């Protein structure tokens, strides 16, 4: 018996993934810095177990892996989903903001992967690193976030190159807009600026040029993560999987033509 570990498991994509995996019969350990949302998610399913820890803390993540292994016999998969903000231009980003953004968006994944690698080798397990389409292109005034998400793809490729022959699979997942509490906050910025009258209108605004015409539900992204962790994707390795409703296929200079 083994379990999956999900960082950033208290809300959004992490919480949706935990529920989906638990419903499928897997044990899941969710990790985050805030106990309250973790416990709320864990209360929804007997197979979801919460550990309060900072995914960027090497000692803390080593303890999470050790506790998971002791309780469940090993680690079957890791979802490196923790992330954070980094919303400013290079010129207006302070040193502290830069460090904080890279810690939240990149270091958390690096530390979690490093902590889990030995157990994942033993189980021949899989890793999914949740990046973003911000890992493929740059939005305005998002220097720290954009750089961190781009770097995650490099991290995935490095681990894939070094650990594939040791039995560990790893892939990057790049979602577009997903309805999560963090995205709701970003929609609220558009409402406050007067660009949209409410959050629903803001989502419509930011997805007006998305070929599917909408944001994803967190459960849709969770299903993609479950696929990448599972037996249906055993030859998918070192890949960057995009789940963005078609956003990144759009030829921006042709938008005026409809």
Task: Kindly give the residue locations of the regions a language model identified.
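Conserved glycine-rich cofactor-binding loop
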Residues: 10-12
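Short, small/polar-rich loop/turn modules that mediate ligand/substrate recognition or access, typified
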Residues: 79, 164, 169, 236-238
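Substrate-binding pocket helix/loop in short-chain dehydrogenase/reductase
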Residues: 89-90, 97-102, 206
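C-terminal substrate-recognition "lid" of short-chain dehydrogenase/reductases
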Residues: 110, 214-243, 248-249
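Active-site helix of classical SDR
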Residues: 113, 148, 156
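Alpha-helical segment proximal to the catalytic Tyr-Lys
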Residues: 118, 161-165, 234
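Residue(s) in the substrate-gating loop at a strand-loop-helix junction
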Residues: 132
């Amino acid at each position: 018996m083994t379990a999956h570990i999900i960082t950033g498991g208290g809300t959004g994509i992490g919480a949706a993934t935990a529920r989906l995996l638990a419903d499928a019969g897997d044990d899941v350990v969710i990790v985050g810095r805030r106990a309250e949302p973790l416990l709320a998610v864990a209360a929804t399913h007997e197979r979801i177990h919460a550990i309060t820890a900072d995914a960027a803390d090497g000692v803390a993540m080593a303890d999470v892996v050790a506790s998971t292994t002791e309780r469940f016999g090993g680690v079957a998969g890791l979802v490196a989903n923790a992330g954070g903000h980094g919303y400013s231009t290079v010129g207006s980003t302070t040193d502290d903001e830069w460090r904080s953004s890279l810690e939240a968006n990149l270091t958390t994944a690096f530390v979690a992967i490093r902590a889990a690698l030995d157990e994942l080798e033993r189980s021949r397990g899989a890793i999914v690193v949740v990046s973003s389409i911000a890992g493929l292109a740059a939005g305005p005034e998002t220097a720290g976030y954009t750089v961190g998400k781009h770097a995650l793809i490099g991290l995935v490729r490095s681990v894939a190159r070094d650990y594939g022959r040791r039995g560990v699979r790893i892939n990057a997942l790049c979602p577009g807009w997903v309805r999560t509490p963090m995205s709701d906050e970003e929609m609220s910025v558009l409402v406050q600026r007067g660009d949209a009258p409410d959050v629903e209108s803001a989502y419509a605004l930011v997805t007006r040029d998305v070929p599917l015409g909408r944001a994803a539900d967190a459960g849709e992204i969770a299903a993609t993560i479950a696929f990448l962790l599972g037996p249906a994707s055993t030859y998918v390795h070192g890949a960057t999987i995009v789940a963005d409703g078609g956003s990144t296929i759009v030829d921006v200079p042709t938008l005026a033509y409809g």
